């Protein structure tokens, strides 16, 4: 395997490319990126054969900001014959044995979506052939590598594999969430996805439990508050604007008509702080830092808008600065994670946990 294939949001190829170049260099693995704007994927071609599999194993997917999914891939397969696309694909996968799952995918672009029906239909005969040849186990296994076949154009595909313990559980790394009919805005999906992505399933009952107190800075009309309320939390919603009437009728929301940058919580028993304000990312980060230094929350989820040209570098700088500020203020035990989630647009979601091993 000579290529590392990374799925990303269309328009963010440059950021994804910059990040993987940086991370590969940290491992002393040489290579170069190949990408085109709005392709929704990046190829990092290694100088040494086999290095792509090393990257796919050693670089944790959750540590990458802009990549939704990645897999080690062979050289691009071109001009696959319409009457037999399977044979060249199986030849390319000859050294992949006993994989646990097959995913036939496309990049997340409007043009590529036209191939989704083909991919779905093509999966059935390809899966059977791979099972018969021993490339794929007879029964799916979540502990074995995942075979990926990604059609980037008609008759053109990258094939390879990802490690099941370092891979998104979703095809192309995209969770399919439903918009609740009573949610005040589509922004609600961002926090829903953030909770799914950052909070392990086995810890949700403890860390997203009914009766917790939360604060939503810049809450109106209540998209993020909605996700807290539906999990049974009591929310202080901070915004000068109007809140959704349905949320207010739950009795779980107290609306403070105030500036989120000036608000100080009257009670200090807050577990969750969430914030999705259209503001300079550095200013939002400084606000979260202030709340952390004051000890006003235990876990926080917030978005940083990305109007900058050098988005990867700027986000990295903001996160590094936050870590430095927390340490300088005697906050030693914390965890910062960041991801460009599917429901994010020109923004990233940051998760900050104080004393991450102490959940109460």
Swiss-Prot record:
Q: Where in the cell is it found?
A: Cytoplasm
- Return one Gene Ontology term, BP aspect: rRNA processing
What Enzyme Commission number(s) appear in the record? 2.1.1.186
Question: Which reaction(s) are listed as its catalytic activity?
Answer: cytidine(2498) in 23S rRNA + S-adenosyl-L-methionine = 2'-O-methylcytidine(2498) in 23S rRNA + S-adenosyl-L-homocysteine + H(+)
Q: Which InterPro entries match?
A: RlmM_FDX (IPR040739), RlmM_THUMP-like (IPR048646), RNA_MeTrfase_FtsJ_dom (IPR002877), rRNA_MeTrfase_M (IPR011224), SAM-dependent_MTases_sf (IPR029063)
**Record keywords, A-Z:** Cytoplasm, Methyltransferase, rRNA processing, S-adenosyl-L-methionine, Transferase
For molecular function, the Gene Ontology terms on record are:
S-adenosylmethionine-dependent methyltransferase activity
Subunit and interaction comment: Monomer.
Which family, according to the similarity comment?
A: Belongs to the class I-like SAM-binding methyltransferase superfamily. RNA methyltransferase RlmE family. RlmM subfamily.
Q: Which PANTHER family match?
A: RIBOSOMAL RNA LARGE SUBUNIT METHYLTRANSFERASE M, RIBOSOMAL RNA METHYLTRANSFERASE FTSJ DOMAIN-CONTAINING PROTEIN
Which HAMAP family does the entry link to? 23SrRNA_methyltr_M
Q: What's the protein called, per UniProt?
A: Ribosomal RNA large subunit methyltransferase M
Instruction: List the lineage, top down.
Output: Bacteria, Pseudomonadati, Pseudomonadota, Gammaproteobacteria, Alteromonadales
The coding gene here is: rlmM
């Amino acid at each position: 395997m000579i290529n590392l294939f990374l799925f990303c949001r269309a328009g963010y190829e440059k950021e994804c490319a910059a990040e993987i170049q940086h991370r590969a260099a940290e491992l002393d693995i040489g290579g170069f990126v190949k990408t085109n704007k709005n392709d929704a994927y990046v190829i990092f071609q290694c100088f040494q054969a086999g290095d792509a599999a090393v990257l796919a194993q050693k670089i944790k997917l959750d540590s990458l900001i802009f990549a939704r999914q990645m897999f080690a891939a062979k050289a691009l397969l071109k001009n696959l014959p319409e009457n037999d696309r399977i044979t060249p694909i199986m030849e390319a996968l000859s050294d992949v044995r006993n994989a646990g799952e097959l995913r036939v995918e496309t990049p997340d672009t409007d043009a590529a979506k036209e191939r989704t029906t083909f991919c779905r239909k093509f999966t059935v005969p390809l899966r059977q052939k791979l099972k018969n040849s021993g490339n794929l186990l007879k029964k799916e296994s979540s502990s074995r590598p995942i075979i990926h076949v990604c059609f980037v154009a008609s008759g053109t595909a990258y094939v390879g594999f990802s490690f099941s313990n370092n891979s998104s559980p979703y095809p192309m790394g995209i969770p399919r969430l439903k918009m609740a009919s009573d949610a005040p805005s589509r922004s609600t999906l961002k926090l829903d996805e953030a909770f799914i992505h950052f909070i392990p399933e086995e810890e949700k009952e403890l860390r997203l439990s009914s009766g917790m107190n939360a604060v939503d800075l810049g809450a109106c009309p209540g998209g993020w508050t909605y996700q807290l309320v539906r999990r049974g939390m009591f929310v202080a919603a901070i915004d000068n604007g109007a809140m959704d009437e349905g949320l207010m009728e739950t009795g779980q929301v107290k609306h403070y008509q105030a500036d989120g940058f000036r608000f100080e919580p009257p009670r200090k028993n807050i577990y969750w702080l969430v914030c999705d304000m259209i503001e300079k990312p550095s200013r939002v980060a400084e606000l979260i830092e202030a709340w952390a230094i004051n000890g006003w929350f235990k876990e926080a989820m917030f978005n940083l808008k990305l109007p900058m040209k050098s988005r990867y570098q700027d986000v990295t700088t903001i996160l590094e600065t936050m870590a430095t500020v927390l340490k300088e203020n005697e906050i030693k035990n914390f965890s910062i994670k960041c991801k460009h989630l599917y429901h994010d647009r020109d923004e990233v979601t940051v998760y900050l946990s104080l004393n991450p091993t102490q959940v109460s």
